[in-house]
Amino acid sequence: MAIASESPTTVTSAGLQTYGQTNVKYDWWAGNARFVNLSGLFIAAHVAQAALSVFWAGAFTLYEISQYKPDLPMGEQGLILLPHLATLGFGIGEGGKVVDLYPYFVIGAVHLISSAVLGAGALFHTFRAPHDLSTATGRARRFHFRWDDPKQLGIILGHHLLFLGFGALLLVLKATIWGGLYDANLQTVRLITQPTLDPFVIYGYQTHFASINSLEDLVGGHIYIAILLIAGGIWHILVPPLTWARKLLMFNAEAILSYSLGGIALAGFVAAYFCAVNTLAYPVEFYGPPLEVKLGIAPYFADTIELPLGQHTSRAWLANAHFFLAFFFLQGHLWHALRAMGFNFKQLETFLNPAIEN
């Protein structure tokens, strides 16, 4: 089966909901559904998607550098990547002033180079590696999976959690060792030498996480998140899903996709609110002032300062983008969850338009 084809692809699938049909045809726009049972091509697709994401990050960073105006506040220029790099302490001097754009250029270039490496990996997995890892030899065979195999899905979940944990740990190392973070309270970049390790303080933010105003607490929270993610990753790699989990969860491609989309939707809603109101992780100097919620055709976050017509702060762009993307991810979660449970949307179409039956 080709990774991309102009003609429909036929898949005999136990992973996706087929409503009893043995052969289901997917056109090119169906994406990963075309090779849902080909574990090798599934990896190729994900590596290619990672390459595109990293390429966008690198290219857009360089684009924002070309558009940056030092005489205007960064938060009022509609930038979305440079503010993140500034918050991490790159190229920032006293008072939150950008004193050096070169670190941003390096980061953009590194992302472009990384995207090329990932793209090469995607091409390798597409054209040279086995399309079905069950036929592979050596360690590669270990990453073959079936959608109805909870043990193997748990191993893959474990590896995902490890990468997320290492990502959280990298932020901790950046804050405590590699140059520090920008402190919006002091308007300077500093090392976080005494992160909060009291679990009661960290857990206390469960009810008001968006009000956090201490970098020590922020970094301490990431330490706990890193520990939990890495420990969870090791657990899922070594321990198959327990009996209660096997009974509670559904193990098929449609259900796994719905779980993933639901998790992304939750993260998106949380990020939207956090970005809209928090000025520690999203300093006013780089993102503009906090937003207010307004209601139009749909809820949205609005700027609280006067800007020229059609212009918005970085905070407004990010908060609204996260909110609306999370909303559509939530719809995808519900769609695939219902399909996983056997709901046939074509029956709904027939119910609403009886003429279809004829």
From Swiss-Prot:
Chief location bin: membrane
GO biological process terms on file: photosynthetic electron transport chain
One of the record's GO cellular component terms: plasma membrane-derived thylakoid membrane
Membrane topology, from the record: Multi-pass membrane protein
Protein name (database record): Iron stress-induced chlorophyll-binding protein
Entry function: Functions as an antenna for photosystem I (PSI) under iron-limiting conditions, when phycobilisomes disappear. In the (PSI)3(Isi3)18 complex most of the harvested energy is probably used by PSI; in other PSI-containing supercomplexes a large part of the energy will probably not be used for light harvesting, but rather is dissipated to protect the organism from light damage.
Any one Pfam family match given in the protein's UniProt record, by short name: PSII
One MF annotation (Gene Ontology) recorded for this entry: chlorophyll binding
Subunit structure: Under iron-starvation forms a complex with PSI trimers, where the trimer is surrounded by a ring composed of 18 IsiA subunits.
TM stretches of this protein: 40-60, 79-99, 104-124, 219-239, 255-275, 318-338
Native source organism of the sequence: Thermosynechococcus vestitus (strain NIES-2133 / IAM M-273 / BP-1)
InterPro entries named in the record: PS_antenna-like, PS_II_antenna-like_sf
NCBIfam families the UniProt entry points to: PS_antenn_a_b (TIGR03041)
Compartment(s): Cellular thylakoid membrane
Co-factor binding comment: Chlorophyll a.
Gene this chain is encoded by: isiA
Statement: the UniProt record of this protein carries the keyword Hydrolase: no
Swiss-Prot/TrEMBL cofactor(s): chlorophyll a; all-trans-beta-carotene
SUPFAM superfamilies in the cross-refs: Photosystem II antenna protein-like
Alphabetical keyword list: Chlorophyll, Chromophore, Membrane, Photosynthesis, Photosystem I, Stress response, Thylakoid, Transmembrane, Transmembrane helix
